[in-house]
Regions:
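Cleavable N-terminal export/targeting peptides
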Residues: 1-26
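Membrane-embedded beta-strands of outer-membrane beta-barrel proteins
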Residues: 48-50, 93-95, 142, 154, ...
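Outer-membrane beta-barrel translocator domains and adjoining extracellular loop/strand segments
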Residues: 39-45, 70-81, 118-129, 164-172
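Residue-level signature of outer-membrane beta-barrel architecture
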Residues: 52, 97-99, 146, 160, ...
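Short glycine/proline- and aromatic-enriched beta-strand/turn motifs that initiate or cap beta-hairpins
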Residues: 19-70, 91, 97, 115
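Outer-membrane beta-barrel "beta-signal"
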Residues: 146, 153, 167-178
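Residues that define the transmembrane beta-barrel architecture of outer-membrane proteins
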Residues: 25, 42-46, 87-91, 134-140, ...
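Repeated loop/turn-to-beta-strand initiation elements of outer-membrane beta-barrel proteins
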Residues: 27-29, 57-62, 103-107, 146-156
């Protein structure tokens, strides 16, 4: 529900600003890949984001990422016949910062709030036990981007999510500016 509300709010703001011809607010959408890990697990995500660039330096963004790999936990019990299946997603909102550099490059950063949802199924001899857990915390990104055209950019960033004792990794994405 929160995701739907955030995306709806972003769409309403973007539609309003699209009609205000003299505004400098620029909406964008993006899609990308994120790899996050901590001491217990490695997770690969595909995700979507959308945002508003308020001026050359400051913006706001909403994001959603869903795990796409077979997540294996340290100490998995496969050798005992227990099969685990996990699904992770994280979503949230953040403030973004950009600083133009030379030759279409720019430095970028984001700080915000992220919620992480974890669903795990464990199956043993035909019996399945399911559990869900969620946590929230800060998300911080620091990286760089390159503008191929005024509308198309690529970004790479170090990412830290503090939920569930912290995850660190890398994010790569393509963005389209309207």
């Amino acid at each position: 529900m929160k995701k739907l509300l955030l995306v709806s709010l972003l769409g309403a703001i973007a539609a309003t600003t699209a009609n205000a011809g003299s505004t400098t607010i620029q909406p964008y959408v993006g899609a990308g890949y994120t790899f996050l890990n901590n001491d217990d697990v490695d997770v690969h995500f595909l995700g979507l984001n959308g945002g508003l660039q308020f001026n050359e330096y400051v913006g706001a963004e909403v994001f959603w990422n869903k795990s796409v790999n077979d997540i294996e936990f340290d100490g998995d019990l496969d050798e005992f016949g227990v099969r685990t299946d996990a699904d992770v997603q994280y979503y949230g909102i953040g403030l973004t910062a950009k600083y133009p550099l030379a030759n279409n490059f720019y430095a970028k950063g984001m700080a915000g709030y992220a919620r992480v949802d974890l669903d795990v199924d464990a199956t043993f001899q035909g019996y399945t036990v399911s559990t869900s857990e969620d946590d929230s915390g800060l998300i911080v990104q620091a990286g760089a981007g390159y503008n191929f055209t005024p509308n198309l950019a690529a970004e790479v960033a170090y990412t830290h999510v503090s939920a569930f004792d912290g995850f660190n990794g890398i994010n790569a994405q393509l963005k389209y500016n309207f």
